[in-house]
């Protein structure tokens, strides 16, 4: 196993522990708590894949971080922070909408790269809105946190989420996954609307890169883009 993979996991475990202590003092905002919850799932998946114990990795990560901080002057730390672009966290969904459990009458699941696509094929003739929470850097998609499909009644009927055991995805991965979700939902004559946030950062207009957003074999009846509700 690559030593960098192990040490990266150890540092991530310790930094998650620090963030958890911060949240336990009720100091974190909603985006912070949401990332904390999702990163916990990711760490569990990575730990299982690597065969590493999280508690042991956390202790090792603490030693690595302490050693770095001892060697790092404050001036260098300030310069590093200033030179790194800060991501923006954009939200279509509330924390309740993101954490709500949902069930499928006719479940369908597909894995595309490091993204898992789930939808309920029992849904027919509905107006459906795609909403997402994501982070962007320099006006480009950095990470899709979660995408969900909602009916007008607020029922969740579809979802795209990163696989905890396979971190990392590109904006093209997200775009392709959205195409699969839309194609599956449109198959039952549902009408799909896309939030302004998704339209801008993950589901850009057709012909932008010389091809339509949906694969040729999928239906093309995208409804008008709606403005973000948040």
From Swiss-Prot:
Q: What's one GO-annotated cellular component?
A: host cell nucleus
Could you provide one GO biological process annotation from this protein's UniProt record? symbiont-mediated suppression of host type I interferon-mediated signaling pathway
Cross-referenced Gene3D superfamilies:
Influenza virus non-structural protein, effector domain (3.30.420.330), S15/NS1, RNA-binding (1.10.287.10)
Chain segments carrying region PABPN1-binding: 223-230
Entry's localization field: Host nucleus; Host cytoplasm
Motif Nuclear localization signal: list the residue ranges.
Answer: 34-38
InterPro entries in the record: NS1, NS1A, NS1A_effect_dom-like_sf, uS15_NS1_RNA-bd_sf
Question: Any notes on this protein's domains?
Answer: The dsRNA-binding region is required for suppression of RNA silencing.
What is its quaternary makeup?
Homodimer. Interacts with host TRIM25 (via coiled coil); this interaction specifically inhibits TRIM25 multimerization and TRIM25-mediated RIGI CARD ubiquitination. Interacts with human EIF2AK2/PKR, CPSF4, IVNS1ABP and PABPN1.
What is the protein name stated in its UniProt record?
A: Non-structural protein 1
